[in-house]
């Protein structure tokens, strides 16, 4: 049994429990989804217990420690408005500005964007990959990776988009057009995987109500604890974006 699988179960146990503690904020469809998530998580726990023995209470406790140890609630209430477009309709995004220390030990976040040959930092390049469109502006290495999610309990769907947000110029330096996932539980699992991979969570006003128990607007710094910036990781990530084109 991999450590990653155990952590995932612990996270789901913690989130399901916390969401059900706030039933007054959930409509019937969402509550049913969370109950289903809790039931499936308990089944996973029983299967895993033969390899990694722990109780339901242990899983909740470990899940809470994992959240509190890696995801920090934003201190600033200042938001930078932006939007993503899905099926011809624009949806607003609220970005939580980065205020995670020790930012001085990660100078790649503070270095200026490098203009291209004609001095234009924001010349967008369009890519098409697996039915999605990626807009990548050039030469920005000071981004924070953001996942925006928008639950729709009435249709039991969750929409999400991946965004690169420049910390220096406070502009979007790249985004992947929003997609829809059938099933809120499935969508939340996808968001969890993205957060654990170093994405920031961004939500709109409606999502704050539904996702507040899983720390809406929380931040996770992929370079947290590094004494020096992980430039190789950054360059590899930017290269992967460029290679995502046709």
From Swiss-Prot:
GO terms for molecular function: RNA binding. Prevents the establishment of the cellular antiviral state initiated by host RIGI, which normally triggers the antiviral transduction signal that leads to the activation of type I IFN genes by transcription factors IRF3 and IRF7. Also participates in the up-regulation of the splicing of viral mRNAs. InterPro entries: Flu_C_NS1, Flu_C_NS2, NS1. It comes from Influenza C virus (strain C/California/1978). Pfam families: Flu_C_NS1, Flu_C_NS2. The gene is NS. Keywords: Host cytoplasm, Host nucleus, Host-virus interaction, Inhibition of host innate immune response by virus, Inhibition of host interferon signaling pathway by virus, Inhibition of host RIG-I by virus, Inhibition of host RLR pathway by virus, Interferon antiviral system evasion, RNA-binding, Viral immunoevasion. This is Non-structural protein 1. It is found in: Host cytoplasm; Host nucleus. One of its GO terms (cellular component) is host cell cytoplasm. Belongs to the influenza C viruses NS1 family. Its main location: host cell. The lineage of its organism: Viruses, Riboviria, Orthornavirae, Negarnaviricota, Polyploviricotina. The keyword RNA-binding applies. The keyword RNA-binding applies. One of its GO terms (biological process) is symbiont-mediated suppression of host type I interferon-mediated signaling pathway.
């Amino acid at each position: 049994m991999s450590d990653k699988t155990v952590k995932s179960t612990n996270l789901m146990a913690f989130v399901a429990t916390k969401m059900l503690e706030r039933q007054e904020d959930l409509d019937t469809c969402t509550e049913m989804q969370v109950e289903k998530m809790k039931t499936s998580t308990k089944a996973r726990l029983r299967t895993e217990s033969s390899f990694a023995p722990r109780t339901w209470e242990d899983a909740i406790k470990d899940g809470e420690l994992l959240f509190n140890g890696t995801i920090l609630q934003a201190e600033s209430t200042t938001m930078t408005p932006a939007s993503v477009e899905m099926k011809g309709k624009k949806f607003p995004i609220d970005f939580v500005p980065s205020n995670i220390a020790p930012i001085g030990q990660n100078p790649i976040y503070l270095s200026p964007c490098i203009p291209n040959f004609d001095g234009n930092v924001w010349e967008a390049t369009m890519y098409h990959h697996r039915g999605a469109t990626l807009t990548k502006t050039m030469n920005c290495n000071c981004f924070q990776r953001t996942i925006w999610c928008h639950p729709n309990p009435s249709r039991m769907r969750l929409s999400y988009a991946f965004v690169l947000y420049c910390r220096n110029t406070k502009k979007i330096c790249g985004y992947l057009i929003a997609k829809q996932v059938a099933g809120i539980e499935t969508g939340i699992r996808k968001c969890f995987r993205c957060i654990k991979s170093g994405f920031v969570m961004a939500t709109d006003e409606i999502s704050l109500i539904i996702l507040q128990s899983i720390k809406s607007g929380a931040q996770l710094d992929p370079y947290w604890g590094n004494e020096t910036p992980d430039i190789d990781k950054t360059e590899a990530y930017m290269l992967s974006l460029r290679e995502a084109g046709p």
